[in-house]
Amino acid sequence: MAFNSQEIIQDVRAEFEHLLDFVTGEQARTAKADSIERGLFKMLLSLGAKLLQLFFAMRSEACSRQPVQSKSGQELPYHRDTERVYFSIFNKVIIERPYFYEKGVGAQIPLDAELGLGDDSYSDLLREITEYLAVYHVYGGKNADFLDRLFGFSLSTRALQQNVAEDAESVAAYYAQKPPPCPESEAEILVIQADGKGIPMVLEEDEVAEAQVRLGKGQKHGHKKEAIVTTIYTITAAPRTPTEVIASFFKENPPKKRLKKDAKPQNKHIWATLDGKDAALSRLTKQVALREGAHILHRVALCDGCEALQARIVLQFQGFLLILDFVHANEYLWDAANSLLGETSEQRLEWVKSRTLQILSGQTVQVIAELRRMAKNKKTKVAQRKQLTKTASYFERNLPYMDYPTYLSNGFPIASGVIEGACRHFVKDRLELSGMRWLQTGAENLLRLRAVAENEDWDAYYAYRRAQRQLRLYGQSVSNRQPLEAQAINSQPVLQSLVGSGHPKHSQLPLAV
């Protein structure tokens, strides 16, 4: 199929005239805004397909058919034009390219390199849009419906999974070469956090062979594997009193005067892996090394009561002050209160608040003693005794990491809200939806791209990946010139103002510059 640029130009002009008539013609005078907007969008997609086809046709016509040199320096004559499909947001478009070939020497298609094409049919923009959706929503179902409603087509679940797998391959390499944040953008306290979250897994082949044909009551086809989520950031010291923490934590009226706004994490970097605690913390040590410097005055490690994680953190991060996450400590008090007073008792809140204040004020030993006294009381039921003892033992084991008065006076963070939110949002909200079961490779791929998105590295990562692909496929480096889409937007003040006023997080969407 031969495409003539002049014929396409005529079609484009005719279609554009049709667009003008659609918004200025007789029917537009009585049309509803909704019908015009919907019609315009579909027509613009159609026009976009023709314009993209015109671009490829003109590039093909301008491409020389004179012999080219192979990598070995031998001459490759023009053989014929060959076609490839370019699957874009405007649907599929055909690209005709001159094909140079000599038997026994090899083949080349120079236009592929000039256009920066990948080794499959999907356009980079289509990949980025669909993968961004896949990072936050299930592969099929509503995700596919959204694409179909927006563009008039969708990708299969298998195609999406394959694209995610391919585009996740370079994430580790990207972060290995990414420079650390500049010291001027950092705060004085370097904070690391680690926590685990279970992901439902399908049985691997060797496990399937050993599985029962018929499961017993309560058994499931699969199991959970722990993903270790790590976070590193810096934060400004924010001294506060136990009373202020209680007021904030229990949503009481805050003090009338606040000397400064709540400190916010700076340059937060999040990561999750199914490769185990050692692999996760080993990577975290490298991140710590990148963030170190004279600007860092204090180092804090926040963790829940997981003994395995605590032991590794103490060993691998010896310059860090390990702090037991205050939220986890408080949860143990709630467990004790529920067991002792009943889950519907109105007395629970005051009981928990008073003992939380004791813990924050450095009286954890007294709380432990009280819990053990109640556990030994003859009137205490067996279940209550078990929970009270469990809570007391948890506090006793973690006493070295519960010097909250010192932490608060120094302005250190005592709650791992960042990592708790990450476990819920980063892992659970995407990988633990109803009915989901994962293979480790599939879950790992998705976790890597979710990290790219959550770390607000989406645009930079995909630019890096395109550059690496150009080098791998064609041995060429990518120009540092301003992208054409940026030039187009910068030449239009209205578009520039729209892009510039966007929400920072949304600026990383594939359509943004």
What is each residue range found by the language model?
Residues 56-119:
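An N-terminal low-complexity regulatory-tail signal and nearby short nucleic-acid-interaction modules
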